[in-house]
From Swiss-Prot:
Source species of the chain: Phytophthora megasperma (Potato pink rot fungus)
One Pfam family per UniProt: Cytochrome_B
GO biological process terms held by the UniProt record: mitochondrial electron transport, ubiquinol to cytochrome c
Described purpose of this protein according to its UniProt entry: Component of the ubiquinol-cytochrome c reductase complex (complex III or cytochrome b-c1 complex) that is part of the mitochondrial respiratory chain. The b-c1 complex mediates electron transfer from ubiquinol to cytochrome c. Contributes to the generation of a proton gradient across the mitochondrial membrane that is then used for ATP synthesis.
Protein name per UniProt: Cytochrome b
Taxonomic lineage of the native organism: Eukaryota, Sar, Stramenopiles, Oomycota, Peronosporales
Length: 383
């Protein structure tokens, strides 16, 4: 068609319609598209909520109640945004673990993987600041605990905390700057996502076999468009069930109590999607050690493309690694469970064991298991 030859439409046509896609992609490869759609949902609902939200410690909690009670369909906007964050992270976690399983970090996709990890870190920062905005008990005390972690940095830690707070405690300046950053970061994420897509289309999509065969590609539209559309319908079905029937299931009841600096909640826990990393933080009794471990658990994801020694992409053809991979999934789920439990026996011990395996997988298994597998293959070939 003539409009396809125009510069703008040509770009859209090349990246959304005629984009060559491996013919054997399964439904797990559609979670990247679902993540993009959830990002759009979050931005749109966030803009509408920002129209009625007041970033002031005396008014923030009441402004959220005003949205829920007085604004037309405000309850729908708020529940969509709150539950949308959870579903956004669900989709992204599946996307990450799919990438780990099918070796989407192996050459030539190193930059693609690293850009995805950066997007994930930006998401976590955005979600944390958004959790502070309702100014409930968990909002206030979560902000206090997490920002205090920077005080573990030698010499300049206390100054960094005061700078983050805008004073000597979590107060009105903190809430204002968190609101500003929470509103700004999604657009930074959009920019990072565009870079992610450019890198993806530069090297092409991976596939379950991990073998690049350009002769086995078909256009994205209409084949994978309809496949992703089906995945979106299933996702939205579950999403709407939570919005309309269980809107508060994924939240914390203490956040319906207005922030009180004079009363500490019995258990201070973040949102569920932070729990695995929160468990890593708590598993080390030393403060600076816990902070290093928590941030290290994210930074280690950036090292995977450069420490990997396997010549085979897909875990389907790596039986030993497959066992290690599923043990990682179990360890990650255990960390998420332990993160919401009290700091006592046996939760502390389970958290420590799971944390050790988490780092063991990325620091030992990925760099050395590939070499061992290559040795076994060549030994049996030469036998």
């Amino acid at each position: 068609m003539r409009w396809n030859k125009k510069s703008l439409f040509a770009v859209l046509n090349n990246h959304l319609i005629d984009y060559p896609t491996p013919i054997n992609l399964n439904y797990f490869f559609g979670f990247g598209s679902l993540a993009g759609i959830m990002l759009v949902v979050q931005i749109l609902t966030g803009i509408f909520l920002a129209m009625h939200y007041t970033p002031h410690i005396d008014l923030a909690f009441n402004s959220v109640e005003h949205i829920m009670r007085d604004v037309n369909n405000g309850w729908l906007m708020r529940y969509t945004h709150a539950n949308g964050a959870s579903f956004f992270f669900i989709v992204v976690y599946v996307h990450i673990f799919r990438g780990l399983y099918y070796g989407s970090y192996i050459t030539p996709r190193e930059a693609l993987w690293c850009s995805g990890v950066i997007i994930f870190i930006l998401m976590m920062a955005t979600a944390f600041m958004g959790y502070v905005l309702p100014w409930g008990q968990m909002s206030f005390w979560g902000a206090t605990v997490i920002t205090n972690l920077f005080s573990a940095i030698p010499l300049i830690g206390k100054d960094i905390v005061d700078w983050l707070w805008g004073g000597f405690a979590v107060d009105n300046p903190t809430l204002n700057r968190f609101f500003s950053l929470h509103f700004t970061f999604p657009f930074v994420i959009v920019g990072a996502v565009l870079i992610h897509l450019i890198l993806l289309h530069e090297v092409g999509s991976n596939n379950p076999l991990g073998i690049t065969l350009k002769t086995e590609n078909i256009p994205f539209y209409p084949y994978f468009y309809t496949k992703d559309l089906f995945g979106l319908m299933v996702l939205f079905l579950v999403f709407f069930i939570f919005i309309f029937y269980y809107p508060n299931t994924l939240g914390h009841p203490d956040n319906y109590i207005e922030a009180n600096p004079m009363k500490t909640p019995l258990h201070i826990v973040p949102e569920w999607y932070f729990l695995p990393f929160y468990a890593i933080l708590r598993s080390i009794p030393n403060k600076i050690g816990g902070v290093i471990a928590m941030f290290g658990s994210l930074i280690v994801l950036l090292t995977i493309p450069f420490t990997n020694s396997s010549e085979i992409r897909s875990t389907a053809f790596r039986p030993i690694f497959k066992v290690c991979y599923w043990l990682l999934v179990v360890a990650f789920l255990l960390l998420g469970w332990v993160g919401q439990c009290p700091v006592e026996y046996p939760y502390t011990e389970i958290g420590i064991i799971s944390m050790i395996y988490y780092f063991f997988f990325f620091i030992i298994i990925i760099p050395f298991l590939g070499k061992f597998e290559t040795y076994l293959v060549r030994y049996n070939t030469n036998k």
